[in-house]
Amino acid sequence: MSSIIDVYAREVLDSRGNPTVEVEVYTEAGAMGSAIVPSGASTGVHEAVELRDNDEKRFLGKGVETAVDNVNLEIADELVGWDVFDQVGIDNYLIELDGTENKSRLGANAILGVSLAVAKAAADENGQRLFEYIGGVNGKTLPVPMMNILNGGQHADNNVDIQEFMIMPVGGENFKESLRIGTEVFHNLKNVLKSRKLNTAVGDEGGFAPNLESNEEALQTIVEAIKKAGYEPGKDVMIAIDAAASEFYEDGKYNMAGDNAVRTSDEMIEYYKNLVEKYPIISIEDGLAEDDWDGWKKLTQELGSKIQLVGDDLFVTNVKRLQKGIEMGVCNSILIKLNQIGTLTETLDAIELAKRHGYTAVISHRSGETEDTTIADVAVATNAGQIKTGSTSRTDRICKYNQLLRIEDMLESTAVYDGIKTFYNLSK
């Protein structure tokens, strides 16, 4: 046993210039763990609560001094003397201390910062990397990157309704090679956009947000970039999309302004079936709204054996909502965002539940990120097989990829990279 002797939080900034919480945990043996909490742009209504000060005189109301004070003035005193290796006990106690269903009293940003810093301090105490501490000898699978290279929806100001268009370089023999493939496609995409005199500035997650005319033009442009990079779409590189459909769901219909169309759930399903037939799409995230359970069930029946259907806003990394999805036969994959649920233990529980029922898990960043690389370690530790952490642009995204390169080097010959086999639950 090694006791926690101090817990300290401060207000720092994320990649969008918004305040967030950083927490440090110290042990009696001299170990230290530090974690910075990310923040989302499009958030599901069922997510754990990110506590903001709502004081318009500071950071336009986005300050997090209340969450910081909750760590320094309440949580810290409770954890002093606690065994740093008792991750489950600490996380469960933090949930109990908060006392709400959605962590709205102390704030999920306060609780998660502490939870992750505890894990990092424990790893430091053991002389281990975080992925080794969480995953043990079995944590050795490098994830296929899901790289956001074109943006629409809430992430852009253009005529594209679908929020994210991503590439998945499945053709590499290892993570390092796949990262290179994805990077080369990204640079070729920039050249394609430049040749059309389109904007090549990057957004929050490092993707381009040019003024394209439609969702299909975005897909066509990506296919062109893949080919120009010297790779074969559908073999070396697959496409994934995040529709973020809750953002354009109104009064039971899907209002896709870019397509000048208002669609029902059934019409959205036909729309996706058509896209999957025409383009090398392997994964659709948030294809329907977060509470359109019946629509999701139909979508899964129609496409669930052919492509990955990822629940993000639908599941919000929540075991209860995932269990409902499993029982209804909804989706075949879950997006894992640590700050949606608020503790490391609950995150690992969600991944484990997904795996037990044949669902894949995609470890994900948020729009507001930092230099913190926790998700890279979690992806390897849990053998998730996939990571969504932006394009190969912006240091807040690159740092996760660089951490994965380091981990792959450390694992040497024991490292595993599954490529297309990461979609083990598909029939095609």
Curated annotation (Swiss-Prot):
One of its GO terms (molecular function) is magnesium ion binding. Pathway: Carbohydrate degradation; glycolysis; pyruvate from D-glyceraldehyde 3-phosphate: step 4/5. Its EC number is 4.2.1.11. GO terms for biological process: glycolytic process. It is found in: Cytoplasm; Secreted; Cell surface. The keyword Cytoplasm applies. The active site is at E205, K337. Its cofactor is Mg(2+). It holds the Pfam family Enolase_N. GO terms for cellular component: cell surface; extracellular region; phosphopyruvate hydratase complex. Binds a second Mg(2+) ion via substrate during catalysis. It catalyses: (2R)-2-phosphoglycerate = phosphoenolpyruvate + H2O. InterPro entries: Enolase, Enolase-like_C_sf, Enolase-like_N, Enolase_C, Enolase_CS, Enolase_N. It is an enzyme of class 4 (lyase). Keywords: Cytoplasm, Glycolysis, Lyase, Magnesium, Metal-binding, Secreted. Its main location: cytoplasm. (2R)-2-phosphoglycerate binds at Q163, K337, R366, S367, K388. Mg(2+) binds at D242, E285, D312. Belongs to the enolase family. HAMAP family: Enolase. Catalyzes the reversible conversion of 2-phosphoglycerate (2-PG) into phosphoenolpyruvate (PEP). It is essential for the degradation of carbohydrates via glycolysis. This is Enolase. It comes from Finegoldia magna (strain ATCC 29328 / DSM 20472 / WAL 2508) (Peptostreptococcus magnus). The lineage of its organism: Bacteria, Bacillati, Bacillota, Tissierellia, Tissierellales. The gene is eno.
